[in-house]
């Protein structure tokens, strides 16, 4: 007898090259597939190396988007019932976006000593270093 699998409850999708095409947009075909999944009760969760502030509005506007995994998995956000307003109320002074506030459900912080060691290694190799803090990416200019 064939093995029965549980119903899919969540689909996590990387942004660049997966959810977004080469031009940085969601295709109509992808949008239709996401809508079909949402109609079956599946959570669609963007997962990205980007900080929350860099989530494209087009992604936040997709049907069924409520949760987002950011910073390469270091933070999980609940955007509530108004994802666009949640993301942009946090990072914008525009009054029209102040409809809700994102809630950080989980964040994994690097110990300070480990961060210092990583910074020293990157500096010695002249490597780019990005630090994510409070939903923003910080770089040494």
Where are these regions (language model features)?
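Preference for short coil/turn "hinge" residues that link or interrupt alpha-helices
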Residues: 1, 12-13, 19, 58, ...
């Amino acid at each position: 007898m064939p093995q029965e699998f549980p119903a899919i409850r969540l689909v996590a999708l990387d942004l660049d090259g997966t959810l977004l095409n080469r031009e940085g947009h969601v295709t109509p075909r992808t949008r239709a597939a996401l809508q079909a999944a949402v109609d079956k009760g599946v959570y669609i969760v963007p997962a990205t190396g980007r900080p929350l502030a860099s989530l494209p509005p087009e992604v936040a506007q997709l049907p069924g988007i409520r949760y987002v995994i950011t910073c390469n998995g270091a933070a999980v956000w609940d955007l509530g019932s108004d994802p666009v307003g949640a993301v942009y109320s946090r990072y914008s002074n525009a009054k029209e976006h102040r409809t809700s506030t994102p809630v950080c459900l989980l964040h994994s912080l690097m110990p300070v000593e480990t961060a210092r060691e990583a910074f020293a290694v990157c500096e010695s190799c002249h490597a780019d270093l990005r630090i994510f803090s409070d939903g923003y990416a910080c770089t040494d200019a």
